[in-house]
């Protein structure tokens, strides 16, 4: 049996919690409280997976993947709570975790230091304002107070790019802050901020759309983002029924990668990818809307990050 130390990972004290699949809202609410304190169970080597903030899609997906791993008995997955993509990549490169979720545009200089297990979900950039706000476009953020996601999150990187494409200079034209999602929502609700940017799946229940908040359409910026920063950005729609009672808007989508340390043994990588391939239905939160990438045509689309050899072997066998 391959043990955790074979990966070279170091404990950082932020142990994850493994939960069963009861949907996105349940995972971040009642079920989370009921199952809090449970650790990874079952057999197989231990993989520490850097996920994201409590209440976010990364956190929910990591919990579902850990539960699927426990059922399989071939690998154990321990979810690690983080700020998001950039912190995840740093932890993976430093050997603090064995696997990580990250936005494809956050990989950057780490492309030669990590390997991909699969392209799993589409993240939606969601610009949120209060329902009574007059802000209708990114350009109208000039002179306002905007939260661009927690330090270490993918939204912090992508958000700064969005501002630049819209003709705004971060810090100069906009008062930028970096708060975790729940803190950012509290500030927005209290009138201490004018907008927040969140990169995540839809719906994200914490955003309280349309009860108190609404989404700003950013679809017109997708092409300029691709032209300036590369092909990672897509124009996607958040349908009206994603947030019941809300309105459909277009925004920018970025693929999520499930990444592994280069030192991960091939059999361990294969065990994780088998979960993506053969237990895909159990890995999609029941309330999730929009594009999901857990299918054969999309899972292997991880360029510019090469597939882990163990992952590639599973995909070859699956496709025949």
Model region roles, listed by residue range:
Residues 69, 73, 96, 101-104, ...:
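Sec/Tat-exported extracytoplasmic proteins
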Residues 39-41:
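Bacterial signal peptide processing site
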Residues 1-19, 28-34:
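N-terminal secretory signal peptides
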